[in-house]
A protein has these predicted regions:
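Metallo-beta-lactamase
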Residues: 78-129
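Conserved beta-strand hairpin/beta-sheet module of binuclear metal-dependent hydrolase folds
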Residues: 1-41, 121-135
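Active-site metal-binding motif and surrounding structural segment of the metallo-beta-lactamase
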Residues: 32-78
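A generic structural signal for short beta-strands and their flanking turns/coil linkers
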Residues: 13, 22, 48-50, 72, ...
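Structured catalytic core of nucleotide-sugar glycosyltransferases
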Residues: 6, 11-14, 57-58, 63, ...
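Sterically constrained small-residue positions within well-ordered secondary structures
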Residues: 8, 67, 114-116
Length: 135
């Protein structure tokens, strides 16, 4: 399991997570050029990203989503409330509420969090005997 914070703060949040053969982003509040550059610094091509997990829909967590979808088309995981309040047309997405079992031997569950947004979630990623909580 590999974890790397690509950006954190009011100007944008984006985290890279690699589990087995799968490569994920948690949030994408940075523009495509910045995110691509940061991914390449850790030897990851943007097109290798399998999915993006959205914690909430504040701009500093989703600003780069539209362009990243256009360029790479990863699957987007978000709640129904997030999707309903997101002003983007997303075709490759999955709605979840509590547990996401989307990749072999990887269990992903969500934690409902309090924040001033229609919905906010943390994630727990479990693989083999390792786990990572992103809250």
């Amino acid at each position: 399991m590999k974890f790397c914070v690509l950006a954190s703060g009011s100007k944008g949040n984006c985290t890279y997570l690699e589990i087995g053969n799968y490569k994920f982003l948690i949030d994408i509040g940075t523009n495509f050029l910045y995110t691509s550059t940061k991914l390449k610094e850790i030897n990851v091509e943007p097109s290798e990203i399998n999915a993006i997990f959205i914690t909430h829909i504040h701009e500093d967590h989703i600003a780069g989503l539209k362009r990243f979808i256009k360029m790479c088309n990863p699957k987007i995981y978000l709640t129904k409330k997030m999707k309903d309040n997101l002003e983007l047309d997303i075709s490759n997405y999955e709605i979840y509420e509590e547990i996401i079992e989307c990749y072999e031997n990887i269990k992903i569950s969500t934690v409902k969090l309090s924040h001033d947004t229609p919905d906010c979630r943390g994630y727990i990623f479990e693989h083999e005997e390792k786990s990572l909580a992103y809250i």
